[in-house]
Amino acid sequence: MNELIRYGLIFLLFLKAFGLDYGIDKTLELKKDEVFKAVIKDTSNEQTKEITLYWTLYANKGLVINMRFNHFPYQFILYTDHARNTYNLKVFEEKFSSNSVLSLVFKDFKEDKATLRLLALMPLVFSPKEP
């Protein structure tokens, strides 16, 4: 029994040491043409960039996303299958040492609402912005 507790504690410490520390983990439920706005901030050097996104069409299990990031427009399609459900975007490309990738994951579509998940590792954080 003592060995089980000891190995359990070692396992928990291992998970804590190597676990992912998300600075951004936000679930979004958006209706068609509903706009989500936020400011993405790098806490290590206080840089900020704006993100605006909305979806316009859901057909054949594909969701058409329109996004504006750092005043640059993007349009892409995300699908519900695992291979094509994520769009990754470099946030601060000028910082080579930082792992500053913002991920938008398409989770589900029910009752005319798309469920998306916005993820990024620390030191990135976000604050919502009024549309």
Question: Language-model segments: what does each one mean?
Answer:
Residues M1-N2, L15, F106:
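Generic cytosolic/nucleocytoplasmic N-terminal low-complexity/intrinsically disordered segments
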Residues N2-I10:
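Sec-dependent signal peptide recognition
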Residues I10-G19:
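Hydrophobic h-region of N-terminal signal peptides that target proteins for export
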Residues F18-P131:
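Surface-exposed, beta-sheet-biased, low-hydrophobicity segments with strongly acidic/polar composition
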